[in-house]
Design a protein with these regions (language model features):
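Positively charged, low-complexity, intrinsically disordered RNA-binding extensions
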Residues: 112-196
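N-terminus-centered regions that define maturation/targeting leaders and the start
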Residues: 7, 15, 32, 75-79, ...
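Intrinsically disordered, Lys/Arg-rich N-terminal extensions and targeting peptides
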Residues: 1-48, 175-196
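Generic structural hydrophobic/aromatic packing signal, biased to beta-strands
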Residues: 26-28, 74, 84, 121, ...
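Long, charge-patterned amphipathic alpha-helical coiled-coil/hairpin "stalk" segments used as oligomerization
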Residues: 42-131, 135, 143-144
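Generic ordered-secondary-structure signal
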Residues: 11, 36, 44, 67-68, ...
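Sparse, context-dependent recognition of short Cys/His-centered cofactor- or disulfide-binding micro-motifs
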Residues: 9-13, 24, 38, 59, ...
């Protein structure tokens, strides 16, 4: 009995030395880190110097087009320093850019908001393979993941794409999106009238 108690005490001593502070996981627009909400309070809770962090982040993302959302991971050290890891933009961002749309479909399985070719998928996979979580995955696995993401966004993956037909499709899609926005606005107004 006493041996097991002494083992537990020794394990507790080792466990006390491990730092289990939470990582900050958030998306920050490239070159637009500011001390205001929502980023400032998140950094303040973890005792990070907000001004130094914003300056560091904006310097690291100076070569990227401003406003692109970048998934960021921040690990805080006990001495208030931090380790900053900036990933590539999300897959959905790349897919929407390749498809030429600003937003995904409201009903992804039933509705198609855009189209991309397999070549687009391959090029995006090459970019995403530089991300730390995907470094050890094969390009085939990343392409499969991107095709699944495209499906959830309402983007169809095709072998070839005709430019004229796709332009007509996008024009038609633009009118559909306008109708959807009007419908949503009407629902919001009706809800406001009910609650007022």
């Amino acid at each position: 009995m006493s041996k097991s108690v002494s083992r537990l005490k020794s394990m507790k001593k080792v466990a006390d030395k491990i730092d289990h502070s939470s990582k900050l996981r958030t998306d920050i627009p490239a070159g637009m880190a500011a001390a205001g909400p929502p980023l400032g309070p998140m950094l303040g809770q973890r005792n990070i110097n907000i001004a130094a962090f914003c300056k560091d982040f904006n310097e690291r993302t100076a070569n990227i087009k401003p406003g692109i959302p970048l998934p960021t991971r921040v690990k805080v050290n006990p001495d208030r320093s931090y380790q900053l890891v900036i990933h590539q933009p999300p897959s959905s961002f790349f897919l929407k850019q390749a498809a030429g749309v600003t937003r995904g479909a409201m009903e992804p399985i039933r509705e198609i908001c855009g189209k991309v070719t397999l070549k687009h998928i391959y090029e995006i996979a090459k970019i995403k393979s530089q991300d730390p979580p995907l470094e050890w995955k094969s390009l085939k696995d990343i392409c499969t993941m991107l095709i699944a993401t495209a499906r959830t966004c309402g983007i169809e993956v095709v072998k070839e794409l005709n430019a004229k037909e796709y332009e007509e499709f996008l024009q038609h899609r633009k009118s559909v999106v306008e109708e959807q926005k009007k419908l949503l606005q009407e629902k919001r107004e009706a809800k406001m009238l009910r609650t007022a």
